[in-house]
Swiss-Prot record:
This is Transcription elongation factor A protein 2. GO terms for molecular function: DNA binding; zinc ion binding. Belongs to the TFS-II family. Residues 6-83 form the TFIIS N-terminal domain. The keyword DNA-binding applies. It comes from Homo sapiens (Human). InterPro entries: TF_IIS-typ, TFIIS/CRSP70_N_sub, TFIIS/LEDGF_dom_sf, TFIIS_cen_dom, TFIIS_cen_dom_sf, TFIIS_N, TFSII, Znf_TFIIS. The gene is TCEA2.
Length: 299
């Protein structure tokens, strides 16, 4: 007999196939099966079924499928919210028992002294606490905005990620790297938020949510490193084009009055012809207006 986790994973795989084939036939039956199952946060995180349901919701044009998928995601979000609330309570409550325990053991100073070095021991320095706490208003506001960015498009529900904990860790890394909350810190936070919310670059957000990109990494990544693959290719092509045009401008070219500049309407131009395609195709002509600097090309 198939276990609950295996059954949910099987449904997730079938939903993924429907998304790949762009066919939602039978989706309602699978979604109803999921609705009837008592799904825990552990099952949500281990099977990643939320990602499959969310992908189906985005692709489907069937209103009934969309509505049921949204209902499931909403109910699973409550599991995450409950988990977040418990984590916050633990974060608030953990220091109190420690201090009260220290107080109860205070009568013997010789016992209290050796315990002090253990609190900031090496593991606490090299690893982050579950939820780094700060009382700074600016830092807390930045954490809220990072949380909102991570929650874009409900990917956190599908992945089963704790956005508040993640945002706190990311902000902590940024603060440690910059050292204060001045303009450099704010610009760093702002650029993370912008890239995490970018609808054209969902992979960055998903990689952060699932841990493929750690808080330490996202905290120091450049705009180029955070960019989508598509934008990276565009930037690469633009750089190549700029280098080529610069090299052509330095070669001088041939001065002519055969071309009319579309910008200043003068005929004082310099042109260069280059074989940019295969040898049996026409050469590309690059033209520079010597009057206003306007550039254009044609084959």
């Amino acid at each position: 007999m198939m276990g609950k986790e295996e059954e949910i994973a099987r449904i997730a795989r079938r939903l993924d196939k429907m998304v790949t084939k762009k066919s939602a036939e039978g989706a309602m039956d699978l979604l109803r099966e999921l609705k009837a199952m008592p799904i825990t946060l552990h099952l949500l995180q281990s099977t990643r079924v939320g990602m499959s349901v969310n992908a189906l919701r985005k692709q489907s044009s069937d209103e009934e499928v969309i509505a049921l998928a949204k209902s499931l995601i909403k109910s699973w979000k409550k599991l995450l919210d409950a988990s977040d609330a418990k984590a916050r309570e633990r974060g608030r409550g953990m220091p109190l028992p420690t201090s009260s325990r220290d107080a109860s053991e205070a009568p013997d100073p010789s016992r209290k002294r050796p315990e002090l070095p253990r609190a900031p021991s090496t593991p606490r320095i090299t690893t982050f606490p579950p939820v780094p706490v700060t009382c700074d208003a600016v830092r807390n506001k930045c954490r809220e905005m990072l949380t909102a960015a991570l929650q874009t498009d409900h990917d956190h529900v599908a992945i089963g990620a704790d956005c508040e904990r993640l945002s706190a860790q990311i902000e902590e890394c940024i603060f440690r790297d910059v050292g204060n909350t001045d303009m450099k810190y704010k610009n760093r936070v702002r650029s993370r938020i912008s890239n995490l919310k970018d609808a054209k670059n969902p992979d960055l957000r998903r990689n952060v949510l699932c841990g493929a990109i750690t808080p330490q990494q996202i905290a120091v990544m450049t705009s180029e490193e955070m960019a989508s693959d598509e934008l990276k290719e565009i930037r690469k092509a633009m750089t190549k084009e700029a280098i080529r045009e610069h090299q052509m401008a330095r070669t001088g070219g041939t001065q002519t009055d055969l071309f009319t500049c579309g910008k200043c309407r003068k005929k004082n131009c310099t042109y260069t012809q280059v074989q940019t395609r295969s040898s049996d195709e026409p050469m590309t002509t690059f033209v520079v207006c010597n009057e206003c600097g306007n550039r254009w090309k044609f084959c």
